[in-house]
Amino acid sequence: MTSESVTTPLASTLVDKEQAADHNDDSQEDISLGGSNDATSLSSLKAIRSENEDANETGQADRNDDVEEDPLLTRYHTACQKGDLATVKEMIHGKLLEVNKDGDSVEHITGLHWASINNRLSVVDFLVSQGADVNSRAGALHATPLHWAARYGYVYIVDFLLKHGADPTMTDDQGFNLLHLSVNSSNIMLVLYVLFSVVSKGLLDVDCQDPKGRTSLLWAAYQGDSLTVAVLLKFGANIKIADTEGFTPLHWGTVKGQPHVLKYLIQDGADFFQKTDAGKDCFAIAQEMNTVYSLREALIHSGFNNDGYPIKKWFKKSQHAKLVTFLTPFVFLGLAFALFSHVNPLFAIIVLFLLTLATNKGLNKLVLPSYGRMGIHNVTLLRSPLFSGVFFGSLLWVTIVWFFKVMPWTFADEPYTNILLLIVLLLVFYIFGQLVTSDPGCVPEETDHENVRQTISDLLEIGKFDTKNFCIETWARKPLRSRFSSLNNAVVARFDHYCPWIFNDVGLKNHKGFMFFITLMECGILTFFKLCLEYFDELEDSYEDRNQELGKCFILGHSDLCSGLRYDRFVFLVLLWALLQSIWVASLIFVQTFQIFKGMTNSEFNVLMKENKANGADGVSFNENFNTTPEGFAPSIELDEDNNNTVLAPVPGSTLRKPRTCFGVCFTVTGMDQWFAVVKETIGIKDSSGHNIYSITSKIPTNYGWRRNVKDFWLTSDVNAPLWRRILYSPTSSKALLNGTEVDYFKLYKLPVKEAEQGSDMV
C-alpha cells in the first residue's frame, strides 16, 4: 500500500474516493446501499448504485462547476495533500488561514481531511496540535478525517487520530463506522488494529450493522478478503446474521466466489442451505454468478459433497486415516519388489502402473476425506504422511532383508560391519520417531488482548506494524528468521524448511537432529551396500559350488551386483532403491552443510534467490506486507535491524507461482532444486537475470564467518555443559547461539552486530 498523493483539491475527486475502496476492485458500490429495489433479483446481480450516491455525485459535480476556487485555499490543500509541512506551517503561523476554518465553501473539506487521506502524518500531527477538529465532517458523505484515513487503510493516521480524540463510533451518511471502513480498505493490519484497539475495548461491536443490515464480516466476504474474514471469525463475528435482503456472509461470499473465504465460512458452520428473502440458497446463487466451481471446492475441502451433504468417512479418527496413509508405502514397496523379482519386467511395469493408480485413487477417495479439515489448504497426498511413510517403508524393507538374508550370510566375514549397521539402523529409527513428533520451535500463540495491544503499539512506534513483523494468525510479533507454518499452525523460530520425509517442519529445536538423521541415513545406505556386495559374493560362490555358471548381466558384467540380480533379485532391488535414495540424501547433506557454513537457513536462501530474480526482472518492487508507514516516519529505527530483516521479507511475485510439473515436484520433494542452486552459488554461475549469485549471498546479514556459523549451529548455548553434550543435544528452549552470544529466538528482533574482522572470514 503506497501513499499516493491526491493532487486535485476538488471535492468531486473525493466522491470517487469515498465511494470506492482503493485496494479492492470490488467496493461497497457493488452492493446496493440505498433504497431497496424489489424488482432486482439475484439473476441480475451487478454493480447496483445507491440512489443517494448518484444524487451526491450529480449534485457535487454541478456545484463544482459553479465554485470559483480560492487560490490561497488551493495552495494550502495541495500542501496538505503532498505533505509539504513547511508550506502548511507558513500559512497557519502567518495567519493566512485559520486551522478550523480551512475548509472549502461547498463541502467544508479541511486540510486535515486531505492530509489524512494522503497518509501525511507530519501534517496531521501539526494541524491537530494547532487545534484542528478531528471529528469535523466534510465531503459528500459528511465523513470525518478518521473515515477518510480508514477507507484507505492508513493505520498510522487512524492510530494518531484516535489517540487525539477522534470518535470511532461516528458514522458517515452511508452509515459506515470505523470498523466498516477498515474492512472496506482490505488492509488486514488496520482491521486488526481496530479490532484490538476499539472493538476489544467495547467501543464498537464486531457485528455492528450498517443501515442495510450488513456487518463487517458480510462486507469482507463480499470483497473476497479471506484474511479479514479469518480474523473476524477468530474474533467471534456471527456468521448467521443476514442483511435486510436475507443475505448472510456465505451468500455474499458465494457471489464473489473466493474459495478461501467460502472455506473459512463453511468450516465455521455457515448454513449453505439457508435462503435469502428471494428464496435462493448458495447453490442457486453460485449457478447464476458462475461460481459453482469455487463453492464445490470449498464444500469438498470442508468434508461435504457437491450437494452439501457430509462425505462418508471410513475412519472415525483422523489419526487412523493418517496411519493408513503412513503404512501404505511399506505394502506398496513390498509388492513392487516382489513383482519385479518374480515376473517379466514388462508385465511388472504394467501391473505396478495399475497398482499405483488404484493406490492413489483409494487414498484420495477413501482415506483423505477422513482427515481433519482446518484452514484453507487443500488436503493432498503431498500434505499427508505419505512421503514419511515412503521413507519408513524403505527403511523397514532394508532392515528386513538385512536381518533375514544378508546378515546370516555375511556375519562370519563382516561381524563389525553388521554390528555397525545395526547401530545405525536403531539410531535412524529412533531419530526418525523423534523428528516426526518433535517441536520444531513453535512460538507460543498470544491470546491475551492486552498483550496484543501492547505489541501493536510497540510496532507502531517503530514503524514496523505489518505482516512481516506481526503474525496475523497467532497475533504475536514475529521474531527474525521465523516463519508461520500452516502444518503446526504456529510461527516456527529459525525456520529452515518443511520436510515431507518426516512430515514436520525443521526449525530451531530439531534442525541439529535432522542433520544427524540424514547423515546417519547416508552412512547406513553405504554400509548396507557394502554388506550386500559381500552377500552377493557369497551367493556367487555358493552357486559356483553347485556348478551353476553365471552369465553376463548387460552393463553389470560379472560383478557381484550381477550375482545379486541373478540369484536374489528381491535384495538387489531393495539395494537399488536404497542407492537411489542416497543420491538425494547426499545432495541434501551438501545443501544443508553449505547453508550452515553461510549462516543462513534454507528458507532464507530461497527468499534470497527469489528476491534476486524479482529485482532482476524489471526493478519494480511491490508492497506485500500491508505496510502503510508514512514517509519520513520513525527516524529512530535502527538501520542494522531493518537491514537484517530484509532477507526474510516477502519478495515481488512470491505469491505468483508457475504451474508445477511432475518433474518439478519430484525435484522439490527430494531437494535437488536446492542442490542446483547451491552449485551455481558455489562456482559463481550467473542466474537468468544476469546477477552473480555469489555477490548476493556474500551480503547475508546472519553470516558471521564460517567458523562462527558452524559453532553457532552445532553448540548449544549452555556453556556450563560438557562439550559432547553441547554438540549432541538440540536446544530444548528458545535460546541458542548467534555470533557466539546467547539469543532468545522467540524474541529475536535485532541481530548481533558483526565485528570488523569477521568480514575477512566469510565464505
From Swiss-Prot:
SMART domains assigned: ANK (SM00248)
Active site: 499
Biased composition (Polar residues): 1-11, 34-44
Enzyme Commission identifier(s): 2.3.1.225
Transmembrane segments: 321-340, 346-363, 384-404, 416-436, 513-533, 570-590
Top-level class of the enzyme under EC nomenclature: transferase
Tagged with keyword Coiled coil: no
Regions of this protein lying in the Lumenal compartment: 341-345, 405-415, 534-569
PROSITE patterns, sorted: ANK_REP_REGION, ANK_REPEAT, DHHC
Biased composition (Basic and acidic residues): 15-26
Locations listed in the record: Early endosome membrane; Golgi apparatus membrane
Comment field on protein domains: The DHHC domain is required for palmitoyltransferase activity.
Similarity remark: Belongs to the DHHC palmitoyltransferase family. AKR/ZDHHC17 subfamily.
Name listed for the protein in its UniProt record: Palmitoyltransferase AKR1
Organism per entry: Saccharomyces uvarum (strain ATCC 76518 / CBS 7001 / CLIB 283 / NBRC 10550 / MCYC 623 / NCYC 2669 / NRRL Y-11845) (Yeast)
